[in-house]
Amino acid sequence: MTFMRLALIALIALSCTAHAATVSVMVVDKEGKPVADAVVVVVPSARGTSSHPLASQATIVQEKMQFVPQVTLVPVGAKLTFVNQDSWDHHVRGSPAGAGQFSAGAKDGFELRLDGRLAGKPAKSLDVSVDKPGGVLLGCHIHGSMRGFVYATDSPWAMKTSAEGQAVFDDVPDGSAQVRVWQADQLFELPAQAVTAGAVIARLNFQLQVVSRRRRI
């Protein structure tokens, strides 16, 4: 391989990496405490491909009368598999989360009846697809204390915040972008923030208008 060809390959690789910028987002609650499992979505104005795509399938387990994980992040069109590991039945319902729950119609959601697991038998499971962006509130008609969430996004750049309330994207295309935050306890979504992704790490802070609920153990 000639020197010129090697140089050309190196130049192409450099140009590809040069267009990937870092955006760091911090989410805190009304009291200034870090919020885990908030969903952060970045919508760049430039076209690109995320190097960390979301999985098109996710499993949500019902165990000890809880949804595990409590917050599931998927792309629009993803398949959700609900698995009942409890020995009693669950009647799972999904409906719009946030303010959307007050104007939702009968067709704006789904219901799944899952029999309890029998000793020595495989757990019962059912699938459902998520075809609209936004938050979905999960509950159970039989056990009113059960509460979980699904968030479907149409942007490839999306992730949940860590226990420290942070979400760091290292592959955002250079240029302007809009950043949105969704959190399960927030009735109305926070206003989006504009950011310019480039050579310097872009840092944004979002503060909720509520105190995040603690997950029931």
For the regions a protein language model found, what residue spans apply to each?
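Extracytoplasmic copper-binding redox domains, predominantly the cupredoxin/blue-copper superfamily
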Residues: A20-I217
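N-terminal secretory signal peptides that target proteins for export/translocation
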Residues: M1-M4
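Bacterial N-terminal signal peptides
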Residues: L6-S15
